[in-house]
Amino acid sequence: MLKTIQDKAKHRTRPLWAWLKLLWQRIDEDNMTTLAGNLAYVSLLSLVPLVAVVFALFAAFPMFSDVSIQLRHFIFANFLPATGDVIQRYIEQFVANSNKMTAVGACGLIVTALLLMYSIDSALNTIWRSKRARPKIYSFAVYWMILTLGPLLAGASLAISSYLLSLRWASDLNTVIDNVLRIFPLLLSWISFWLLYSIVPTIRVPNRDAIVGAFVAALLFEAGKKGFALYITMFPSYQLIYGVLAVIPILFVWVYWTWCIVLLGAEITVTLGEYRKLKQAAEQEEDDEP
């Protein structure tokens, strides 16, 4: 009886072990950590231009003025743990200075922000090993749509959350709304990663694979925020070594860690489909054998 249970357990864990080996092989072949480092560098270069473009778009719509403030606090509180206040102060100063630039400088900001979009596109299609290129005009339209519609959708979601907060006076809905608001960052990350893995690759991505990969990435991202904040609080080595400049390495490490999570979710999404194809091919070979 015990031997039978052990055999069943081995039979069930064997596919998982094979999938994990395939995942590790793909991570190694794609140089995932190197790609994450490249994206982290481009992200830091594009961070201020991207934020400047986003909030310039909000400034063009007066009805989003209150939402713009909420979005700013939400981004720095949920996407830059522990040192979000310091980084927010510096970035807001940089953005304020960028508002004084000429039209040529503003175009440079937009180009730099689009450079980040292109780098993300290139990295994800490298992981999917897609050789099919989009037309340049189509790519530019997609990048511009992300720059314009992305912040507006985020602002709309924050407006909804603000509306939910306004309903907390109803005692019957208090617990439900608290639970919804507690998981709201996780849901937002999940949806964002799912859209990223579904839209950016130039080949068709199975929806269920994108959902699973996005969910794992969202969980790791939320856990990473808490773990990184705990590390900065409990082991303040960066502050001791760098002093007031500690915000620079802390920001870079966090951005690098974030891109590792994003690319790992992409690798998981790809590996799910690849493992399924390999399994089907192996079963087909067994059926063809006499």
From Swiss-Prot:
Chain segments annotated as transmembrane: 44-64, 104-124, 140-160, 183-203, 210-230, 244-264
Gene: yihY
PANTHER family with a match to the protein in the record: INNER MEMBRANE PROTEIN YHJD, UPF0761 MEMBRANE PROTEIN YIHY
Main subcellular localisation: membrane
Keywords associated with the record: Cell inner membrane, Cell membrane, Membrane, Transmembrane, Transmembrane helix
Organismal lineage: Bacteria, Pseudomonadati, Pseudomonadota, Gammaproteobacteria, Enterobacterales
Family matches, as InterPro entries: UPF0761_bac, Virul_fac_BrkB
Name of the featured protein: UPF0761 membrane protein YihY
Subcellular location: Cell inner membrane
Pfam families given in the database record: Virul_fac_BrkB
One cellular component term from this protein's GO annotations in UniProt: plasma membrane
Family listed: Belongs to the UPF0761 family.
Lipid bilayer topology: Multi-pass membrane protein
